[in-house]
């Protein structure tokens, strides 16, 4: 048995989203995956309720994806897609994605390696498009507070999370942020969901008018805000937002990185909320996380301008060495085949009711303000006195403590501040779901006790 403390403490990695003090702690080193479970280097088994990072939808041991990678590695391990050269897996995957996305007619696919790169690409596409139309001033992008769109320069700027901006000179001046559509947290007394949506839509239009519609190029949104805590759009929100965007000739970018490929019980979040985007970003579940790959879906409206005008203003000079990597594309293509064959949205809908109802049964806990979710995505918000305006003291780290208790009992969740996210793989069995609910309950009981102790110490 390996000794984590001796072997890995003070390790050589500069880890993502990790503070310096954490480098002196024992890291959790994951060594093996099997179905809905992962195992650490000491052999401890954990139910992985975040699908890695929202991505391993088909679980950790789907042999068909491994075989697809192996077959492609033995045929053509790499070739690029520059200068009108490409590979068959990339062409086949592009065609399949265009057929699969039906919320609006898409015409072209551009491959990247991550959701961050996809959203960076979206902004460059929008800028190129407006330059091609002779509108160089139409460049600003509107995103939303609390949104997560990635961590590269542009995508981190689009993200509405202050810790991602601090010390990085972000957001850039061309990025604007409008309000987060979290009804529970931000509605006024007596305000209905539809009235809340109307107020936010009116504020969005005021922002556009104040900036000048001729300067605003696009609006980017996740159908459901994932990392922010599975924040669902309030009633009529996207209908009202899209009407404003059309009125002012502003493009809609749908960030489907988390929501896409069945997570919400529909193939895409755009299907669930009647979104008709001009551009779409997909990643994560595209390959079930087995290979790094993402894609940008481009509507006919935009692609026709780019293709026709590039002969006049110059080529769309953007791309990555690994854009359309043949192995990643082969794995993604097999994942999409599995989603179709297994009718994955039906699978999600069959287990999501018990998942949602089983966990929302804990909503009466005195330390929980809201449990919200849809499909196989759910978030628990810990607050004092069940009020969004009364958070626990930061140093109490209530969400972090809950996550640590879950890990102690053999379950991994994502704890960000005092909200805890769960997005389990679609392979989750009913027995595993029972285990998930049981561990959640045990960890919650421990956390309630911990909060009571902290409150008594404060008196």
Swiss-Prot record:
Is Transferase there in the keyword field? yes
The reactions it catalyses are: vanillin + L-alanine = vanillylamine + pyruvate
Tissues with expression? Confined to the placenta of green fruits at high levels. Barely detectable in the pericarp and seeds as well as in the placenta of mature fruits.
Q: In which pathway does it act?
A: Aromatic compound metabolism; phenylpropanoid biosynthesis
Q: What is this protein called?
A: Vanillin aminotransferase
Q: Which residues form a coiled coil?
A: 430-457
N6-(pyridoxal phosphate)lysine carried by residues: 284
> Which keywords accompany this UniProt record?
Aminotransferase, Coiled coil, Pyridoxal phosphate, Transferase
GN (gene name): VAMT
Instruction: Please report the organism this UniProt entry assigns to the protein.
Output: Capsicum annuum (Capsicum pepper)
Which InterPro entries does this one have? Answer: Aminotrans_3 (IPR005814), Aminotrans_3_PPA_site (IPR049704), PyrdxlP-dep_Trfase (IPR015424), PyrdxlP-dep_Trfase_major (IPR015421), PyrdxlP-dep_Trfase_small (IPR015422)
């Amino acid at each position: 048995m390996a000794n984590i403390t001796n072997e890995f403490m003070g390790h050589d990695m500069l880890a993502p989203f990790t503070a310096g003090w954490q480098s002196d702690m024992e890291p959790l080193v994951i060594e093996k995956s099997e179905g809905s479970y992962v195992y650490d280097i000491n052999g401890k088994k954990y139910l992985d309720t975040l699908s890695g990072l929202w991505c391993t939808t088909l679980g950790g041991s789907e042999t068909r994806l491994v075989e697809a990678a192996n077959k492609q590695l033995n045929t053509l391990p790499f070739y690029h897609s520059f200068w009108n050269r490409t590979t068959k897996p990339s062409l086949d995957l592009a065609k399949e994605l265009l057929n699969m996305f039906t919320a609006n007619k898409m015409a072209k696919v551009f491959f990247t390696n991550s959701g961050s790169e996809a959203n960076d690409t979206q902004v460059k596409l929008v800028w190129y498009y407006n330059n091609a139309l002779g509108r160089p001033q139409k460049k600003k992008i509107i995103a939303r507070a609390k949104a997560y769109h990635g961590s590269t320069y542009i995508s981190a700027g689009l993200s509405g999370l202050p810790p991602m901006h601090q010390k990085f000179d972000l957001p850039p001046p061309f990025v604007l942020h409008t309000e987060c559509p979290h009804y529970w947290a931000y509605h006024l007394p007596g305000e209905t969901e539809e009235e809340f949506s109307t107020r936010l839509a009116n504020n969005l239009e005021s922002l556009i008018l104040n900036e000048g519609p001729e300067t605003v190029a696009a609006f980017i949104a996740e159908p459901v805000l994932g990392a922010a805590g599975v924040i669902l759009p309030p009633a009529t929100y996207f209908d009202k937002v899209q009407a404003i965007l059309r009125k002012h000739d502003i493009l809609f970018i749908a960030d489907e990185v988390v929501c896409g490929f069945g997570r919400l019980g529909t193939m895409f979040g755009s299907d669930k909320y009647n979104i008709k985007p001009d551009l779409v970003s997909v990643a994560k579940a595209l390959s079930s996380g087995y290979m790094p790959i993402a894609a940008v879906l481009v509507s006919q409206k935009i692609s026709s301008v780019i293709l026709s005008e590039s002969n006049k203003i110059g080529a769309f000079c953007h791309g990555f060495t690994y854009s359309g990597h043949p192995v990643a594309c082969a794995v993604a293509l097999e994942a999409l085949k599995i989603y179709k064959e297994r009718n994955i949205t039906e699978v999600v809908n069959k287990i999501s009711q018990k998942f949602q109802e089983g966990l929302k049964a804990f909503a009466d806990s005195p330390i929980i303000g809201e449990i919200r979710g849809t499909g196989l995505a759910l978030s628990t918000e810990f607050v004092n006195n069940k009020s969004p305006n009364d958070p626990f003291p930061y140093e109490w780290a209530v969400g972090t403590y809950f996550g640590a208790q879950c890990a102690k009992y053999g379950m991994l969740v994502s704890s960000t501040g005092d909200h805890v996210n769960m997005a389990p793989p679609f392979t989750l069995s009913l027995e595993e779901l029972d285990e998930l609910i049981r561990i959640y309950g045990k960890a919650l009981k421990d956390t309630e006790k911990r909060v009571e102790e902290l409150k008594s110490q404060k008196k």
